[in-house]
Design a protein with these regions (language model features):
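Bacterial N-terminal signal peptides
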Residues: 7-16
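Boundary at the C-terminal end of the N-terminal hydrophobic targeting segment
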Residues: 17-21
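A short beta-strand-turn-helix
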Residues: 22-40
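Short pre-active-site segment immediately N-terminal to redox-active cysteine/selenocysteine motifs
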Residues: 38-41, 45-49, 92
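Thiol-based oxidoreductase modules, predominantly thioredoxin-like and allied folds used
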Residues: 45, 64, 69-83
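Typically the conserved alpha-helix immediately C-terminal to a functionally engaged Cys/Sec
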Residues: 54-67
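Structural micro-motif
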Residues: 88-97
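Non-catalytic, surface beta->alpha helical segment in thiol-disulfide oxidoreductase systems
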Residues: 100-128
């Protein structure tokens, strides 16, 4: 069943991303590589049509710009790779997971994460 209003909302939110930027998505191989890169890493486990996930894209893009080469911020679409999502204990979309320089998970958040709260959590975890 198609819900026209929901479809229109997803399209409207997606259209706003092109103006505000987006964060690249990883495949399973890319996920493995990024977690061994010895850089701070933020992965949003979500999906391309999940409304809160789409809403997070401008926040993630702003964080990537703010941290530059000090951190890698990426998407991982659990809708495409359920096995890997299970391995990371992802139960809800979106879930943002922060990994330290060794690839160890240091914090996670479920749902939309406002930028100021996200920055505060990253600083508390050690990424400044």
């Amino acid at each position: 069943m198609f819900f026209p209003r929901l479809g229109a909302l997803v399209l409207a939110l997606s259209a706003g991303l092109s103006a505000q930027g987006h964060v690249p998505a990883l495949d399973p191989r890319g996920l493995s590589q990024i977690l061994t890169s010895k850089k701070w890493t933020v992965i949003e486990f979500g999906g391309p049509t999940c409304v809160p996930c789409v809403k997070m894209q401008p926040v993630l893009a702003e964080l990537q710009q703010a941290f530059g080469s000090r951190a890698q911020i990426r998407n991982f679409y659990v809708t495409h790779y359920a096995k890997e999502a299970q391995a990371h204990k992802i139960m809800v979309m979106p879930t943002q997971v922060v990994f330290d320089l060794t690839g160890k998970e240091v914090t996670r958040h479920i749902g939309y994460w406002p930028k100021d709260e996200f920055l505060s959590a990253l600083a508390k975890a050690g990424l400044k």
